[in-house]
Amino acid sequence: PKSVAIVGGGYIGLELGCALTKLGSEVTIVEGMDNILSIMDKEIRRPLEIWLKKHKVTIHTNALARGAEIKGKGASRKVNLNFDKNDENHTLKVDKILVTVGRRPNSKGWGIENMGIRMDASGNFIRIDRQCRTSAPGIYAIGDVAGEPMLAHKASAQGEMVAEIIAGKNREFDKIAIPAIVFTEPEIVSVGMDPEQAKNKGEDVIIGKFPLAANGRALTLEAEKTGGFVRVVARKDDHVILGIQAVGSHVAELSGEFILALEMGALLEDIADTVHAHPTMTESFHESVMKTLGHAIHST
């Protein structure tokens, strides 16, 4: 479409918004909260916000969509989106409206209530234990039906575990963290805790950040143009890595090393003492760890 309004500034709305913008659509995002992508902290969001502004994506925050009405016919057909912002009603005329909010679990009407399966406090998701067992003997639940995070890779891991349990193996779903990736422009990766989350849990942390503009491989991929970086959050006293975040082109490919570091309880020194090939994007992780330790080589 020539113009599209996206209701919802979460990861789904932003991923599709970036894609539509690159395809030539005029995109407007209507978000009810104070910020877009509120699941990420301000520092991580900033390069994305710069990209959206540069590509003339209009963003309305603290705006609540109230309804839509189709006007005209044929080539002149438009959709009017009505939304409230700053105690005023606004109307936006576009070719299409994409609603990316308001997802609800489709857990009603399947006879679950007749099988002795207990739901969580919200009544929407199936309650499970660390082996994905439900309250009904012999019945397991994995993926979205069992609640957040509703991610395909979590569901796959749970499914593999349940298959092994059924085969007689002793397994539990005890993950330190599950990677969250936002495929926007630029990409965003987060595993574990960000600085604010760590401090809210009473952790005394040290933080290191390395810019992609100082990474040779990122320069060849033009990833430095996004203002991206890799950030490491570690406990100050024992140097255990608590979280890793990254923003920039192609950073999704770094998520495997990030999550492995957390899952294995890596210390900053473990990563610092690991040789990372040059020139690769993974050097950015190594450099951010060195920065956290105060031994930065390619940044100040």
Where are these regions (language model features)?
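Conserved phosphate-binding and hydrolysis motifs of nucleotide-dependent enzymes
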Residues: 8-13, 102, 143, 243
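Short, surface-exposed charged micro-motifs
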Residues: 67, 116, 131, 231-233
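Glycine/Thr-rich phosphate-binding loops of Rossmann-like dinucleotide-binding domains
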Residues: 14-15, 107-109, 149, 218, ...
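Rossmann-like dinucleotide-binding cores of NAD(P)H-dependent redox enzymes
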Residues: 2-5, 11-90, 149-156, 164-197
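Short loop/turn motifs at secondary-structure junctions and domain boundaries
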Residues: 75, 116-118, 221-227
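FAD-site-proximal beta/loop scaffold in flavoenzymes
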Residues: 1, 91-166
